[in-house]
A protein has these predicted regions:
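General beta-strand structural signal in soluble alpha/beta enzymes
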Residues: 66, 94-96, 115-117, 136-138
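Hydrophobic packing residues within well-ordered alpha-helices of enzyme cores
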Residues: 4, 76-79, 105, 125, ...
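ALDH superfamily catalytic-core signature
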Residues: 87, 112, 120-182
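N-terminal Rossmann NAD(P)-binding subdomain characteristic of aldehyde/semialdehyde dehydrogenases
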Residues: 1-54, 87, 91-93
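PLP-dependent aminotransferase-like
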Residues: 32, 50-102
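A structured beta-alpha segment of the ubiquitous adenosine-cofactor-binding alpha/beta core
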Residues: 26-27, 94-111
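Beta-loop-alpha module in the N-terminal Rossmann-like domain of NAD(P)-dependent dehydrogenases
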Residues: 37, 44, 96-104, 117-124, ...
Length: 182
């Protein structure tokens, strides 16, 4: 709940009308919802990733088609049931299945696609989304460095490196994968 409140606060702030002027003219920019957003999430954080990817779209007034990983479809279905208790009817719908259903979702008439997963799948999404000039947000796995500076507490850095490298069996896009000591 705290995370959703934080996300809501950030979205509301980001969507405030922006006013600019050059002294002669005044322009006010308003943000409108995009429409239907596809949210394709990985298996390793079956509630955290959908929340991070989907909630901003919903709070901004969009609808969402949520495709959880085929490894954890029941978690996605149950999470959507919880959210749908407070959302208007049909604002959030779940699509379950394999990559084939993901491809069909990407090729459907959605305005935004969010995806966290492999680079190979991300490339396919970009290829198909580009044909429809769809907006795309991708997180394709990082190669995250831990940078240890000269004045660092080496014991604390070593503990952090070990725990962060193997968190969730090391299958986290922000796990430490390399260490630079300055």
């Amino acid at each position: 709940v705290t995370s959703i409140s934080r996300i809501a606060d950030e979205v509301v702030e980001a969507l405030k009308p922006e006013e600019t002027t050059d002294g002669v003219t005044r322009t006010i920019s308003y943000w409108d919802p995009l429409g239907v957003c596809a949210c394709i999430t990985p298996w390793n954080f079956p509630m955290g990733m959908p929340q991070t990817l989907m909630m901003p779209s919903l709070i901004a007034g969009n609808t969402a088609l949520f495709k959880p990983s085929e490894e954890v479809p029941l978690v996605g279905i149950e999470y959507a049931k919880i959210l749908n208790k407070t959302l208007p009817s049909d604002v959030l719908q779940v699509v379950v299945g394999t990559g084939e259903q993901g491809r069909e979702l990407v090729e459907s008439d959605v305005q935004l696609i969010t995806f966290t997963g492999s680079q190979a799948t991300g490339k396919h999404i970009l290829e198909h989304a580009g044909k429809g000039l769809k907006r795309v947000l991708l997180e394709l796995g990082g190669k995250d460095p831990l940078i240890i500076l000269e004045d660092a507490d080496l014991d604390a850095a070593a503990k952090f490196a070990a725990s962060n490298s193997f968190r969730n069996t090391g299958q986290v896009c922000v796990s430490t994968e390399k260490i630079f000591v300055m």
